[in-house]
Each structure stands twice: as structure tokens, then as C-alpha cells.
């Protein structure tokens, strides 16, 4: 009977082991907490996989929506430039009294301003916003300048050139006198130049609103990607 009773050294060792187990379990509990958050175990991780997949799916869905909005805004901007090209072609054909090759001139005045606006806007606004190296004021300024350059100046110059060549080819306007060629053409198209003030104002306003809208969309996208600490 005496041999079955634990000796003093054995009971002391058992107490040390129990105390060590308590400390180890306490260390494990402390290790499971990091920055006030409980680290999930393997079992919790299995249950958390569907939640992570759902979060990633929502992230990708919001990214696709943002990309759709960006593309849609660029397309609308290009369409407005195409409409300005159609108006410029109509005005200068009337000024030069040209009635030939209407389909060819309207096709070029519709397509080229659209492509120029879309490409220029992507290079100077969209790419800059995605890199984060542009402010709101700079975004609005670039957008409005693109509207003026690609939506008014370029279509007007293109319509002047194409319809001026047709006017000379088909002799629909008097031949300019020597030494006054530029003045002659300016007098012929002064009415058309005044009429282009309407799309000029529209492109400036549309460029400002499009720049503000595009910047706000990118800011929301960055806020979702980079959460607050």
C-alpha cells in the first residue's frame, strides 16, 4: 500500500507538469489572438472559405461595374465628338455650297473624331486615374481640353479641309484672288465658325462633368480596394 502512494518528488513533478500545461494553454490562447482578432483554426478556415469566395466575387463584380462605367463615359464622350463632327460637316458644306460626296465626308467626320477622343481620353485621363498620379482639378482640366481639341477643333479643321477641297474641285465657290487666299476662305466660312460655338460650349461642359464623374468613380474603387485602418 505504501508503494502505491505517490512520493513527494512524484507529486511535485506532477504539479510542475500541470502548471506547465496551464502556461502552455495560456500561451496558445494568447497566440490565437493577434491585434485584437481571433486567428481562425483549421475548422473555422473550412467554414470561412465560402465567405472569402463571396467577398472576392463582390470585389470582382464591383471592379467590373467600375470598368463598365469608365468605358461608358469614354464612349459617351466620343459620341459627343462624333456629333460635333457631323455638325461641323453640315455647316461647312453649307458654307462652301458643296453637294457632292456627302457619304464619304460624313463617314470620316463621324469616325475620326470619335477615335481621336476615345484614344486621347484613355491616354491622358483614364490611365492617369488608374495610376493615381492625377488630382481632381487636373482630371477636369484634361477632360475639358480633350473635349475642345478632339470634339471641336479637330472636327472643324477636318470639315474645313475636306469640304474646301471639294469646293475647289467642283467649283462651287469663287476662286480666291492671289494674295488673299486665307482671307477669302475665312470670309466664306465665318458663319460656320460662329455656329461651332454651340458644340464648343457643350464640349466644355460635358468634359467638366465627365471628368468629375470619372474621378469620383475611381475614388470609390480605391476606397473599396484599400480599406481604412
Curated annotation (Swiss-Prot):
Q: Which cysteines are joined by disulfide bonds?
A: none
Deleted gene: phenotype: Reduction in respiration by about two-thirds, only when the electrons were fed into complex I via the NADH-linked substrates malate and glutamate in ADP-stimulated mitochondria.
The question of whether Magnesium is a record keyword is answered with: no
Pfam families found in the cross-reference section: TMEM126
Its transmembrane ranges are 71-91, 109-129, 140-160, 198-218
Give the keywords, sorted.
Answer: Chaperone, Membrane, Mitochondrion, Transmembrane, Transmembrane helix
What are the annotated GO cellular component locations?
mitochondrial membrane; mitochondrion
Q: Does the keyword Membrane apply?
A: yes
Localisation: Mitochondrion membrane
Q: What PANTHER family does the record tag this protein with?
A: COMPLEX I ASSEMBLY FACTOR TMEM126B, MITOCHONDRIAL, UNCHARACTERIZED HYPOTHALAMUS PROTEIN HT007
The record's note on quaternary structure and interaction partners says:
Part of the mitochondrial complex I assembly/MCIA complex that comprises at least the core subunits TMEM126B, NDUFAF1, ECSIT and ACAD9 and complement subunits such as COA1 and TMEM186. Associates with the intermediate 370 kDa subcomplex of incompletely assembled complex I. Interacts with TMEM70.
Its protein name is: Complex I assembly factor TMEM126B, mitochondrial
Please tell me the species this chain comes from.
Rattus norvegicus (Rat)
Write the lineage as a comma-separated list: Eukaryota, Metazoa, Chordata, Craniata, Vertebrata
Instruction: Identify the gene encoding this protein.
Output: Tmem126b
